[in-house]
């Protein structure tokens, strides 16, 4: 036995090497004694360690066997026989001779499998609780000595539950595992930091003594105020959650700011590249002047513009209202599917009143400014011609004729459009089409064709355009109602101002009677307050007209421009249906002339069919391009108009608040000085 494996085992456990039977008896006796003295052995650890160290120094296997001469039975046969019989009886009672696991001990082909070190059966011990002598694993053991496995059990089992050793081994294994775990954690794991807990710790309130706080506040009062303001601004701009940034998603604050500026300046859905920006442009419309005699009287406005796009960097010209309408139609013809800033509506009655002229001047200036802010429209040839031409009357007619826009003397509604055949088919083919009366000339030939054949009709297939057009009609109707309500409010406010003025004059008349000097002074001051209120009402009425009224009017006219681009798509769709109808007719005629392929009539008919096919392809291409352009423009238009409407509401609200504050101050001053 190796005493280093089990230091607490009895010293005499392995001294008897005479036979297996005696050894089994002694081991069983030791087991019973060990169970009785377990508690004493736990308490006396120092004695056991001393015994273990003593056992290590002495070789028990080579020690001579001690014999008592008085008790020796070697020379007495009776005592020796009696002693042997007693020992046999005791061994047979405690350990039968038949060993059920003898075959396992003596067989060279069978072995006992023990549990691996991962799941110990008893108290975490990895070794088998049944330990046999060395003959089990002796390769020279004879197979004849093996017995049947099914026989009765015999042998010399050792102590099954060695609690002291198990505890010592378990503690040692646990400490080794703990050391390995900590070592692996130190080498593999990295320290984890919770961003939310870190933010809470940064914002955590730390109590400080009042004296120190007062001293800091007195010494650094300016710095403290600045830091508080900075912290408030940072908290306002700070996101709700601080998400950790990873790898490619990390961007510097400068890049974020640059991207936000690009997003804000670039219209949503616009096909203009984000890097392209509008060139700086200054436009001003001022100095309206009445020109002409009774039959040709009109108002001319001075248009001043400054930009690097102009040939001379500066231009000053005079333009009338119809010139602004010409510009609108030309831009509409040059840029299909794009929302063009509209001019004011044509109005014949009251066109020479002062308020009307000022309102129209403001609207035309707003139109030019919006065109200048668009990077595409500001570079248009017709727009630059409008700003710089000194002989605009003749040059505008030439441009309208060359482009086929029909912009001269236009008096139609802003939502009505005209599709230029020159812009659609090209100059050569358009000349032939116009010579024959237009694209839809075939559908209007003669009275009989109108009576007995149905005209081709275009039906919109895309739900987007149907839905958006319906919403635009509803929005336009509601805005017109709101504009009328605003006019009623303005009229009522002007009526209130007139009534206030009349009341003030009556109070002044009453004060002129001079019943008493204090009374007259009080009444005169009272009348002055009402005059000031009357002036405030007139100013607020004018302010609301110039903000909400102009904004609503511009919104309604812009919706007319949006309806115009929808009508452009419908017009192109109508031309597409007409050309397709003509193609079908020509195709049927070619089918009838199929037998006369070499005839002159067949060749002429086939040439006409090829021309119609080319027109059909061009029209379909333009129809699809306009549809895509409208979808992009509509989203950007909605965003811009929402922003403009909100700004107009804010300005109107601020003006109303200032007007009410002025009235309150007037009444407070009157009360403090006179009452």
Curated annotation (Swiss-Prot):
Chain intervals with Basic and acidic residues compositional bias: 195-204
Keywords of the record: Cytoplasm, Endosome, Golgi apparatus, Membrane, Phosphoprotein, Protein transport, Transport
Record-given protein name: Vacuolar protein sorting-associated protein 5
Misc note: Present with 6120 molecules/cell in log phase SD medium.
Alphabetized GO MF terms: phosphatidylinositol binding; phosphatidylinositol-3-phosphate binding
GO BP terms in the entry: endocytic recycling; protein retention in Golgi apparatus; protein transport; retrograde transport, endosome to Golgi
Domain notes: The PX domain binds phosphatidylinositol 3-phosphate which is necessary for peripheral membrane localization.
Gene3D superfamilies, A to Z: Arfaptin homology (AH) domain/BAR domain, Phox-like domain
Entry membrane topology: Peripheral membrane protein
Subcellular location: Cytoplasm; Golgi apparatus membrane; Endosome membrane
Keyword Ribonucleoprotein: no
Binding site residues for a 1,2-diacyl-sn-glycero-3-phospho-(1D-myo-inositol-3-phosphate): 320, 346, 360
GO cellular component: cytosol; endomembrane system; endosome; endosome membrane; Golgi membrane; retromer complex; retromer, tubulation complex
Sequence ranges assigned to domain PX in this UniProt record: 279-394
Organism whose genome encodes this protein: Saccharomyces cerevisiae (strain ATCC 204508 / S288c) (Baker's yeast)
InterPro entries: AH/BAR_dom_sf, BAR_Vps5, PX_dom, PX_dom_sf, PX_Vps5, Vps5_C
PTM section of the record: Phosphorylated on serine residue(s).
SUBUNIT field: Component of the retromer complex which consists of VPS29, VPS26, VPS35, VPS5 and VPS17. Component of a retromer subcomplex consisting of VPSD5 and VPS17.
Compositionally biased intervals (Basic residues): 168-180
Role this protein plays: Plays a role in vesicular protein sorting. Required for retention of late Golgi membrane proteins and vacuolar biogenesis. Component of the membrane-associated retromer complex which is essential in endosome-to-Golgi retrograde transport. The VPS5-VPS17 subcomplex may assemble onto the membrane to promote vesicle formation.
Stated family: Belongs to the sorting nexin family.
Highest taxon of the lineage: Eukaryota
